[in-house]
């Protein structure tokens, strides 16, 4: 009887294979979860760009700092923009200033060698200037300039006087008077309107340009002279 029961049990198990495949519910859910995690990792490895975008979105949503690479790129971008703005400003602004005579070296640029002036002469506005090195009396200086087809230095306006005083040493100018009782006149016989210092001294009857001012001096003194020739 016992042998029959044992045989029946073995036959029942053989005829019902589904019982052998049945597993506890707990094991089924555990295996399923593990398979899902493996599948998710494989997706992440296959799509690194999507994963990186997801991280950026997480940083943006949570208000956290971006990665160092992103900060470096942003800083370099700002530096490039500043440099480009500086270059554009230089390219546009400098020609504008030069065209409108705002350059600090405007006066120096006006005093340049010109093709219409003899060699070693400079030009300013519409005149050529000879820079003398010899010391002579006022009358000798007048004759020396005449031999150069020019006249002893003359002053037409305040701007010219300031310019010449800034680049030339003290020198005779073509202005004199016969005595302290006579007015100052140019070598062309025209009245000279600019103020000359020490005019009360009767022995000082020739004019000198000296550091942004005009001063009277003895005509027989030896001084440097400069000549002027109008174009």
From Swiss-Prot:
List residues of the C-type lectin domain. Answer: 116-229
Look up keyword Cell membrane and say if it applies. Answer: yes
Q: Which UniProt keywords apply?
A: Adaptive immunity, Cell membrane, Disulfide bond, Glycoprotein, Immunity, Innate immunity, Lectin, Membrane, Receptor, Signal-anchor, Transmembrane, Transmembrane helix
Protein's cellular compartments: Cell membrane
Region annotation (Disordered) maps to 1-32
Residues crossing the lipid bilayer are 71-93
What's its membrane topology?
Single-pass type II membrane protein
Task: From the record, give the cysteines joined by S-S bonds.
Answer: 117-128, 145-227, 206-219
Sugar attachment sites are 100, 149, 178
Location, primary (coarse class): membrane
Q: What's a single GO MF annotation on this record?
A: protein antigen binding
**UniProt feature, compositional bias: Polar residues:** 1-12
Q: Which Gene3D superfamilies match?
A: Mannose-Binding Protein A, subunit A (3.10.100.10), YojJ-like (1.10.287.770)
Spell out which residues lie on the membrane's Extracellular side: 94-231
Cytoplasmic topological domain:
1-70
Quaternary assembly: Heterodimer with KLRD1; disulfide-linked. KLRD1-KLRC2 receptor complex interacts with TYROBP homodimer; this interaction is necessary for the expression on the cell surface. KLRD1-KLRC2 receptor complex can bind with low affinity to HLA-E loaded with self-peptides derived from the signal sequence of classical MHC class Ia.
Name of this chain's protein: NKG2-C type II integral membrane protein
Q: Which gene encodes it?
A: KLRC2
